[in-house]
């Protein structure tokens, strides 16, 4: 082989070696590129998963946050349904009585016939609710005064006022459903049937049957003799045996009869006991009572009296039974 041919062969071999090296480099570069692409894809997939997971967690938190008010609302609804069992704790308005034990409980005594040293007017309003009840509530709000409503079913279209009064912190008592002397005093059973009827209506409004009652005409009424001799002597004992307490009064506005506003004020402000259970009416037609209330309240408040609603520990006025 000539020197030229040998040199040419060497050159060809060199070119082949260089070409092989170049191919290897390209192959390595391709492998690296593929690895980089795979790594990028893996990072993208992982990032996408992380984003989705974060979004999922965020949505769960948002959903939980949205549900919290609903849960609170549900809890409030449950509390309202059991209002007669437990309510008004902690920062409860001191002028509103603790009503957790106001439901009738046979065998549990209610009230005391001993007056407290505190100067208190227990304003009581009979024979409502009616078209006058809202005006009475507005006046009580204005003077931050609490009262007790001995309600009947004579005007059932106003029964929502029972809950309205209760929600404002006033006490609800029962005065029989019909307030019909001939009906309620026909017999002991007749009285309790009528009382149960008003109890059912009150329970529908405030969630329980209260232990506070007032007899039509008071326990000392004599009209009951016309229907059943001796019935009041039986009833005053039987209502207490069944867990109720009956409330008469030791002060009256005299609005059971037709009186002017001035006459009502003069009569209602003539009492000076430490504890005054004051009889008034919020029934239909008692507009003069509504007009007299501001002056009555102002009079007693100026003398240091507080207007409170009856509760289980309040003073109880009992008249002498005449039948």
What residues fall within each predicted segment?
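A cross-domain feature marking catalytic cores of carbohydrate-active enzymes
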Residues: 125-127, 151-154, 174-176, 214-217, ...
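A short glycine-rich beta-strand->turn/loop micro-motif centered on a GG-aromatic cluster
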Residues: 150-153, 304-318
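Gram-positive cell-envelope targeting signals
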Residues: 1-70, 300
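Active-site beta->alpha N-cap acidic-glycine motif
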Residues: 93-191, 196-209, 299, 315
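Catalytic domains of cell-wall/extracellular-matrix polysaccharide-remodeling enzymes
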Residues: 181-279, 283-299, 305, 319-323
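Hydrophobic alpha-helical membrane context
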Residues: 35-36, 138, 187, 293
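Residue-level detector of transmembrane insertion/anchoring sites
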Residues: 37-38, 116, 165, 271
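N-terminal, intrinsically disordered, polar/charged segments of Gram-positive cell-envelope systems
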Residues: 44-118
């Amino acid at each position: 082989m000539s020197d030229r041919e040998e040199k040419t062969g060497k050159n060809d071999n060199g070119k082949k070696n260089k070409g092989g090296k170049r191919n290897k480099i390209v192959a390595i570069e391709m492998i690296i590129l593929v690895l980089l692409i795979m790594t990028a894809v893996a990072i993208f997939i992982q990032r996408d998963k992380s984003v989705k997971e974060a979004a999922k967690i965020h949505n769960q938190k948002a959903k939980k946050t949205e549900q919290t008010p609903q849960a609170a609302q549900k809890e409030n609804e449950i509390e309202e349904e059991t209002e007669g069992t437990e309510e008004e704790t902690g920062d409860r308005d001191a002028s509103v009585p603790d009503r957790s034990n106001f439901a009738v409980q046979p065998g549990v005594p209610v009230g005391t016939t001993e007056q407290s040293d505190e100067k208190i007017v227990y304003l009581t309003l009979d024979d409502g609710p009616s078209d006058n009840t809202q005006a009475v509530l507005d006046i009580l709000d204005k003077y931050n005064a609490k009262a007790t409503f001995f309600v009947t079913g004579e005007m059932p279209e106003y029964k929502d006022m029972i809950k309205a009064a209760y929600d404002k912190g006033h006490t609800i008592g029962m005065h029989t459903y019909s307030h019909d002397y001939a009906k309620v005093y026909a017999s002991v059973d007749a009285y309790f049937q009528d009382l149960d009827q008003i109890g059912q209506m009150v329970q529908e409004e405030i969630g329980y049957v209260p232990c506070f009652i007032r007899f039509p005409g008071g326990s000392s009424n004599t009209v009951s003799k016309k229907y059943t001799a001796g019935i009041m002597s039986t009833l005053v004992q039987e209502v207490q045996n069944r867990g109720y307490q009956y409330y008469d009064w030791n002060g009256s506005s005299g609005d059971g009869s037709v009186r002017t506003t001035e006459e009502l004020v003069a009569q209602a402000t003539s009492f000076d006991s430490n504890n005054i259970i004051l009889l008034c009416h919020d029934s239909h037609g008692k507009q003069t009572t509504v007009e007299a209330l501001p002056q009555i309240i102002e009079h007693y408040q100026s003398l240091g009296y507080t207007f409170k609603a009856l509760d289980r520990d309040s003073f109880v006025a009992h008249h002498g039974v005449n039948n």
